[in-house]
Amino acid sequence: MEIKFNYKKSKRKLKKEVEKYVLCSMIIFKQTQIKFDKDFILSEPIGHAPPNTEELSFLQSFNKVVNSLSREGREVFIRSFLLNESDIKIGGILNFSEFSIRDRRKEAMKSVSILLGCAEFERSDKKLTLQN
């Protein structure tokens, strides 16, 4: 029996987490613009000292997970999921093909969804066989 990452279900759940992230940001900071620096490290807006709430805790956890990706992974993830840019546009900016961006997006999405606990896996009935 083989266990495989379910891309479609995980992407759906991750998009809900991204929507929650944007909503929490709006509630706490009263703005929809996501803050990140030139290295695509997510951060809280400067000059805000929000109370310690469940929303703030979620924002900080989300930022920590995304910021744990490589610089390239962060940029692809933020541009794809938070800024909703197309693979073609991201590829033009980073000088990669659309297909290369798609592969990088999938890898970043898989890492983030696993770390946030929203990844879905499925079992296949394929039997693994070893060949000599």
Placement of each model-derived feature along the sequence:
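N-terminal interaction/assembly modules
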Residues: M1-V65, F121-N132
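A short pre-motif secondary-structure segment
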Residues: V76-F77
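Cytosolic nucleotide-binding catalytic cores of signal-transduction proteins
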Residues: S80
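Helix-turn-helix DNA-binding module
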Residues: L83-S100
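Residues within the DNA-recognition helix of helix-turn-helix
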Residues: R104-E107
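Short, Lys/Arg-enriched C-terminal cap helix and immediately downstream tail that follows
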Residues: M109-D125
